[in-house]
Amino acid sequence: MRKCYVKEFHKLISYSEGIEIQQKAFDFVIRNNIDGILLLLQHKPVITIGKSGGKNNILASKYELDKYSIDLCHTSRGGNVTYHGPGQLVGYPILNLNNFQKDIHLYLRQLELILINTVREYGIKAGIKPKYTGVWVGDRKIAAIGVGIRKWITRHGFAINISVNKEHFKLIVPCGIKEFGVCSLEDFTANVDYNDVVQKIENNFKMIFETDLIKEETVDNLFERSNLNLRIT
């Protein structure tokens, strides 16, 4: 059985901190030839521009971004423009696909399946939309996916809306798609618990990738012994 480590962060993480954490985890996976590390967190409000994105899909002025304390960052992930913020669970799987299957399209479908299964556990009919990535409920996207892969090790990942401020999505053209909107779990289910979503994501991750997940205390001990500090102060 494969073995991955999972690190949950319990405070809001800036996007730049998230990039730094991913790079540390990426280097750790290479150096120790482990199967992977799953990072789970919530970001401080940020608009990110992927490789295929452009500022033409940002509708907000600098004044508006400053008013709402929203950062703007270019990123190496695939995809267009998206928003991250509180009430949205972001997952960064740093997986060594050399130990799984070296197939980028399969990897994307596996991420979609994790998210679809999780959303459906709340009684919500979620699925994919032909020609588009991510997970959808009707014509509204509930979870986005954007990845990067180097040396067959993955970076970036997915974001699932739980109780995110959807007004902030009005500041952009999400993923460059004008004709469709976004939604959150809370639109369909009252009182969704963030930690419950985390647990469901972890369970589906284990099932889809056929791996054990080693939890936080062991992870911190392992990283500290290896001089890898993923703690945010």
Swiss-Prot record:
GO cellular component: cytoplasm
BPL/LPL catalytic domain span: 32-213
Gene3D superfamilies linked: Bira Bifunctional Protein, Domain 2 (3.30.930.10)
Protein purpose: Catalyzes the transfer of endogenously produced octanoic acid from octanoyl-acyl-carrier-protein onto the lipoyl domains of lipoate-dependent enzymes. Lipoyl-ACP can also act as a substrate although octanoyl-ACP is likely to be the physiological substrate.
Provenance organism: Clostridium kluyveri (strain ATCC 8527 / DSM 555 / NBRC 12016 / NCIMB 10680 / K1)
EC code: 2.3.1.181
Keyword tags: Acyltransferase, Cytoplasm, Transferase
Transcription regulation as UniProt keyword: no
More about this protein: In the reaction, the free carboxyl group of octanoic acid is attached via an amide linkage to the epsilon-amino group of a specific lysine residue of lipoyl domains of lipoate-dependent enzymes.
GO molecular function, one term: lipoyl(octanoyl) transferase activity
Name of the protein in question: Octanoyltransferase
Protein family membership: Belongs to the LipB family.
Site (Lowers pKa of active site Cys): K141
Catalysed reactions listed for this entry: octanoyl-[ACP] + L-lysyl-[protein] = N(6)-octanoyl-L-lysyl-[protein] + holo-[ACP] + H(+)
Keyword Cytoplasm in annotation: yes
Principal subcellular localisation of the protein: cytoplasm
CDD domains: LipB (cd16444)
UniProt pathway: Protein modification; protein lipoylation via endogenous pathway; protein N(6)-(lipoyl)lysine from octanoyl-[acyl-carrier-protein]: step 1/2
Residues at the active site: C175 (acyl-thioester intermediate)
Pfam families: LplA-B_cat
Subcellular location(s) per record: Cytoplasm
GO terms under biological process: protein modification process
Principal EC category: transferase
Binding positions for substrate per the UniProt entry: R77, G78, G79, N80, V81, T82, Y83, H84, A144, I145, G146, G157, F158, A159
